Every structure is written in C-alpha cells, then in structure tokens.
Amino acid sequence: MSVSKARLQSVVRLSRTVPYSKTMVRSFHVSCAVKNSGNVPTPRNKSFFSRALEMAEVTSSLSMLGAVALFQSLRRLNNSSPKGKSGVPKKNIVVLGSGWGAVAAIKNLDPSLYNITLVSPRDHFLFTPMLPSCTVGTLRLPSITEPIVALFKGKIDPSNIHQAECTAIDTSAKKVTIRGTTEANEGKEAVIPYDTLVFAIGAGNQTFGIQGVRDHGCFLKEAGDAKKVFNRIFEILEQVRFNKDLSPEERARLLHITVVGGGPTGMEFAAEMQDFIDNDVKDMFPELQKDIHVTLIEAAPGVLPMFTKSLITYTENLFKNLNIKIMTKTVVKDVNEKNLIVQKTNPDGSKAMQEIPYGMLVWAAGITARPLTRTLMSSIPEQSGARKGLIVDEFFRVKGVPEMYAVGDCAFSGLPATAQVANQQGAWLAKNLNVEGKKFALHERIQALEKQLGEKEAPSQVAGLKQQVEQLKLEPFKYHHQGALAYVGDEKAIADLKLPFMKKMLPLQGIVGHTFWRLAYLNELISARSQFMVLIDWLKTRLFGRYDAKV
C-alpha cells in the first residue's frame, strides 16, 4: 500500500489527537472510504513479490515510526522528572491502583509538593487497548506492560511502592489497610496513613450472577487473562489433533470459539482470533483450519453502539465475509462446562431457549464495581444512591469523605468507562491536586512567618503570599471526547474521530486505519521500551507469523 506524503502527514497530525480507551479501543485499520461502508473487500492470497514489497514498506515505515516514538518517549521522560524544590512542606498522598487513572494522576503530580505512595495488586501498568493482540501472539505481553518501579523512577521512592491489595479504608483516621499479594508478603497486612487519598482501583468483570462464567470462561481485562486465552487456544488445537477418536459432535464443540459481548473488547478479540485462524492455523494446524470458527453473542439489538451506523454496518459485513457469526438479541442465561444456555429473541418478538456447545468462552460483557468500592458505597451515608461507582463531584471529590478523590471505572461521573476518560480524569485531578499542594505549602510558610515575626511585623511580610493563595483556583473537570477506535480484522478497523474543526464525528474504515492506529498507539505507549518492543513484535508477526510457543 502506498500513501501520499500529504496523507501520511495528515495521519501523523491526527494521531496526536486520538486517545485510547480502556475496554473500548484497541488496534484498528482505517480506510479513506468513509461513506461506502457496504463495500467490504474479501481476503485474498498475496504473491511472494507482493508480500516482499509489503514487508519492505512495513520495515521502512516502522523504522521511521520507531525513531519518532523514541524521541517522543524520551521527551516525556525528561519532562516528568522531579523538580526537586527543597524546603517545601509536603503532604502524604496515597494512590490506590496502577491503571489509566492512577498512572495519569501520578505522572502529572508535582513530587516537590507530595510524598507519593502507590498501592496496587499488580507490579505493572498494562496498555489495555492492545490486550486482544496478545491473546493470539500478535504482540507479547511484556511489550505492553511497564514495571511500576521503572515507570516512576525518580518520582516515587521504591520503598513507597507496595504490591498489595487495599482491604479497608478508615476515612475518619485517614488510614488504609493493605494485604500483600506477592509470594514474599502474601497475607501480611500493613496500615498506611495519608493526608490525601486517590481511589483508582478500577472495576471487575460483570457476570450478571452466572457462576459458570467464572468457573468455565476466560475474561480479557488483565495480562494474565490474555495468557490464559492464549494457552487455552493451543490446548484445544492440540487436543483435537491428538485425539483422533473424538466424535464429530465433540470435535465440533471444541473447535467452536464463543465470545460474549459486542463492545470493542469482544469484537476485537473475535477479529484477532479470526486473523489467527486465517493466517497461522493454516500453517500450524492445517487439518483444523476449515473447522475452527468464531461466534460472537450480544444481548442488545446491535454491536458497537458507540460507533456511527455506517461503521457498524461495515463491521457486520466484514465479519460475515470473514465467517465470524454474530448473534444479537441473545441473552446468556447459564454456562456449564460444555454449553451456553441462551435466550434468543426472534424477529417476530418471540423468545426461544437454545443450547450452544463451545470449546472456549471469552466473556467481555461489561464491568461492575469491585468489593472494596461496594463496601464504601454501602458504608458512607452520602453514597447511598451509588450503583456503578463512588459518587464524585466535578473535582473528583468523593461525596461524604474529606480528602478522598476517585477517578476511572471506580467512580461514577456519568461518562463511559473507558481508558480515554480515566486518563483525562487522572491528569485533571493531578492538576488540581498540585494547586492544593501549593496552597498547603504557602499556608505553611505564612504560619511560619507569623510565628517568627509576630503579629505586628507579619502582615506586611505575608501579604504577597496570601495574594498568591487567593490566585490559586481549582478547575472543574471538562471531558474532551477525541474519538473511538476498534480493530475489526483482516488488517482493517473502524474509527469515529472528533476533530476540533468539525461538529460531527469523522468516520473512517478499512486498511489505511492500520497505519493510523499504529501511529496513534505508538504515540500513546507509555515508554520508549514498550514502543520498541511493539514495533519488533509487529515486524516479527509480519515476517514469521504469530508467536506460537506457550511460555
């Protein structure tokens, strides 16, 4: 594919404005055919010359992108270093979580104003938009995870980073109780005091009370989830290959991959899985390729409701061409080891129960509040009306609790539960916390001067400081929606972009989006290390196929 210089420059400019979303957006390829959504190209075999030319183009493009991404990452790293103001009184701030909201907050906090402590059950930040790519080996998990200690080197004292789970919060005494999650400190508890608390623990998987989902299904929210899916895929393929005496029914069941949830996460996994079947199973398990298939189940009337109608139609047509079956208006009622029990709404409005055999179930049907969040919602009187998360105001202050803030999926703000929202919330909160930190430092200086100089001389000395305090104002949060992206398979994607000079969303679809997506997410990857490793993974997949060793 050749792209004009002007168009490439346009794509680069757009990549700086498009964010990422948490369960929402992952990889995608975008075409300039904005309105011709029904014209879906059919996958085709490429000649050796075409593939060689494509490889050369990809190599040169990725080399250029790698240099740009490396420069940008080093620049961000330099800008995030501590300012090191000496002698300024600091408040102790505890941040719970290591996801989008927590990381954005810490990255933007001024370490000269706060002593920062981080508590998280995991020791890394996960770039969730690319997680579906790890389920089939397009990318490797280490490429999209960043160690917390390395990420905040020079900003947080390593002794203040705790791989632990917060089990209780005493909002009156301003203390959190944590329990270790590593082998070395598993089960051990500690208590950490705070002046300010940032609650950013995210959300859990919504199962609607169906126990069989947790017993037999796979989720797609954490790094370990992707590894579990990856291993399960190969277990199924090897089991069917080895056991020649399987009945036709059992063989068909094992080779049926089912996905529940028609949002971006579910759609993107289905797309990645079909790519794996079309491009890699044919080489590793050629006798199984024609039989393994993917079905996506969605309770609502349609998939991807956050996108424009033309993009939804494009995706549905593409999935049909790729042999991915979509079942809408289908509610999962129960899950056992081998079957899904669903209720299907027919075109005439009647309902019918159906049993769907499956070999692997990937559950991507939404999120729900974590137990600690639910405990807070039930124990704080001002949170009595909370359902999806803690009720916060426009400054992210938790209603009913002083000096406690909440951002991301654990907070209810009326906005979608996406990485884009959490990232903006975390950065905005940090900006306001820096204002609060400056006010605190100025008040401390004023009190010290008044104590040192006495009541007669102090007013003239502290007048300027008090004026500075008056000028420091908090700003209510303003969300800037920048678009939605989703990979839909066969090196194609969809995107609704919000551009500052346009009132309506700009819908994009198809192959050009692959370049756009890579530019956008390379720019958003949190470190030069991750950018380099992702580039290598893409190149490796292009040249040698997907990663196929279960390690």
Swiss-Prot record:
Entries under InterPro entries matching the protein: FAD/NAD-bd_sf (IPR036188), FAD/NAD-binding_dom (IPR023753), NDH-2 (IPR045024), NDH2-like_C (IPR054585)
Catalytic activity entry: a quinone + NADH + H(+) = a quinol + NAD(+); a ubiquinone + NADH + H(+) = a ubiquinol + NAD(+)
EC number, UniProt record: 1.6.5.9
GO biological process terms held by the UniProt record: mitochondrial electron transport, NADH to ubiquinone
Binding site for FAD: 92-122
Superkingdom of the source species: Eukaryota
GO CC term, one of those recorded: mitochondrial matrix
Single GO term (MF): oxidoreductase activity
Cell compartments where the protein resides: Mitochondrion
TM helices/strands, residue ranges: none
Enzyme class: oxidoreductase
Binding residues for NAD(+): 255-291
Function in brief: Catalyzes the oxidation of NADH.
The protein's name in its UniProt record: Probable NADH-ubiquinone oxidoreductase C947.15c, mitochondrial
